[in-house]
Amino acid sequence: MKEIVIVGAGYAGISAARKLGKTFKNDADVKITLVDKHAYHTYMTELHEVAGGRVEANAVKYDLQRIFNKYKKVQLVTDTVVGIDEATKTVQGESYSYHYDYLILAMGGEANDFGVAGVKENGFTLWSLAAAERIRAHIKECCAKAEHEPNQAKRRALLSFIVCGAGFTGVEMVGE
């Protein structure tokens, strides 16, 4: 039996799992396992809406079971990957180990502050659902403080926000 392990249920991981699930649908000699730390897919391109308070967090979470409902060949596993042993062809999760013959790494990327001074210490990233909720809470807190601030300069400072980055995420966040 050939075992294919896909690490990460973002756009690339889901796309790979669906394609492989369809390709090997009737092949009993192929096992496909999709491992992700969450039982849901986060619609990353909509995180700005959560951060801006336009939608609730659940609106950008998609249950992996629903996504793969008709892809019976794909086994979904919720686990956090902590290592990969190339010699033994094993993905090590916090809960289990997963042997593979073929491995697809689709964990996504990470936010980059490009070395801009002060961003890492004072800023937020918009790279996860939890981060979007932290940004929303921060904005609400600043607005609540500004509402009761009599000093115009302090009030303006509380209501001033800087977005570092003019990529898709940054531009969408400014639009919120």
Predicted regions, residues:
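Conserved glycine-rich "GG(E/T)P / GGGxP" loop and the immediately following alpha-helix
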Residues: G165
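FAD-binding core/adjacent interface of flavoenzyme oxidoreductases
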Residues: M1-E3, V74-I162
